[in-house]
């Protein structure tokens, strides 16, 4: 059985100095000798702590502008030396055991994320000594504790106090895992950065540098295990990025309710990303990753009421997302009207939380307010590979539109067209959305032919008794034939917004003119598979 190991000597060298003075002080108060380097050593000395510079300890100065500091046998021998096995050779060379290494690495990711970061800047932020010490300590975790996260400082001090200044083997093992994860993620970032530069450095002007590296290394942190995946025979877990910058389902705090399922998370993401498209108070109701009702209003209560009207049947057991704080009136309207799986909003008022507490099975998430949408990559696994593309942040404004029909859209038709175009972006292809007065009235999703999506949208509107005449229709991609326009005209659509680009555009435009429909081209497609 592995024994607890006392901490008598620690080497501290950190880039992120949050909490390091307090941690070092706590170690010193418990009799731990402190070794340190560079800026960390100066910080500790300025705080009045007894600290020995590594250069004084090794008798070898820092050199090459700090490139060589800790790469010395007295450092790595002290870390890698096996207690009880290498003691004689360590004594022969005056190598003292180092029982704890506290290191985090140069901020490479933050450096290369800066606009106009040069290759020289990137290179100078590649840590060499840090990862070497981290790996050495993690390798010898039987005898050495390696600390790479400031969030572990408090727990380490508590355990030392409970174990006469020692750390248990299980703790050292867990810390070693974090250390290997830390260096793996760090090396992955460097490999991705340099891999993305390959085309430019080989004279390939067709492939933009900085987007798609030669090899792609992904690092995600497990947030939770799940009872099962999309289906009950599939195991699943939820992994998140380490430093998520945009409010999302990954950052959301669950305030109540059962654990989120795989499908809950997928559907909640779809709802939240859709509602982010709107500046006005908006509500999106999602079922099976497709919006089934979307509306904007003077406030979120009116937005919810109108979104629900689109398809009350599908809204049952759905996911509801808002882009404003959830208030008590809206919470009451939801729980008195329907069964809901998840509600997500930037924040939840205390009054709304009190009301929702009576429905403990409802999962309630507060995700925080988003200031902007972050450009990132999207991934889709295929058997044996991974498709990678830019996240679809594209959206048109009124100035981007081209009216291609004889009739110009009215101001109201134009507003409705832009509204349902935003919704169509989040509907599975082939996608057709009918909208009127900033409210969806029919959604046709995921059909193999576009005309059937148009027909389904009309059927949905008719089933709910919603007036289609004078409404706008959005299509996520071009119409390959005129039949979709004929189907829209048959139910009273007066304005169509679509990307255009079909070899039969002239035929489709002619159909719009025959029916007196205003037709708008966006010149932007929003396939969603």
Curated annotation (Swiss-Prot):
GO terms for molecular function: IMP cyclohydrolase activity; phosphoribosylaminoimidazolecarboxamide formyltransferase activity. It comes from the Bacteria. InterPro entries: AICAR_Tfase_dup_dom_sf (IPR024051), Cytidine_deaminase-like (IPR016193), MGS-like_dom (IPR011607), MGS-like_dom_sf (IPR036914), PurH-like (IPR002695). SMART domains: AICARFT_IMPCHas, MGS. SUPFAM superfamilies: Cytidine deaminase-like, Methylglyoxal synthase-like. It holds the Pfam family AICARFT_IMPCHas. GO terms for cellular component: cytosol. Gene3D superfamilies: 3.40.140.20, Methylglyoxal synthase-like domain (3.40.50.1380). It catalyses: (6R)-10-formyltetrahydrofolate + 5-amino-1-(5-phospho-beta-D-ribosyl)imidazole-4-carboxamide = 5-formamido-1-(5-phospho-D-ribosyl)imidazole-4-carboxamide + (6S)-5,6,7,8-tetrahydrofolate; IMP + H2O = 5-formamido-1-(5-phospho-D-ribosyl)imidazole-4-carboxamide. Keywords: Hydrolase, Multifunctional enzyme, Purine biosynthesis, Transferase. GO terms for biological process: 'de novo' IMP biosynthetic process. Pathway: Purine metabolism; IMP biosynthesis via de novo pathway; 5-formamido-1-(5-phospho-D-ribosyl)imidazole-4-carboxamide from 5-amino-1-(5-phospho-D-ribosyl)imidazole-4-carboxamide (10-formyl THF route): step 1/1; Purine metabolism; IMP biosynthesis via de novo pathway; IMP from 5-formamido-1-(5-phospho-D-ribosyl)imidazole-4-carboxamide: step 1/1. Its EC number is 2.1.2.3, 3.5.4.10. Residues 1-148 form the MGS-like domain. Belongs to the PurH family. NCBIfam families: PRK00881.1, purH. The IMP cyclohydrolase activity resides in the N-terminal region. PANTHER family: BIFUNCTIONAL PURINE BIOSYNTHESIS PROTEIN ATIC, BIFUNCTIONAL PURINE BIOSYNTHESIS PROTEIN PURH. This is Bifunctional purine biosynthesis protein PurH. It comes from Serratia proteamaculans (strain 568). The gene is purH.
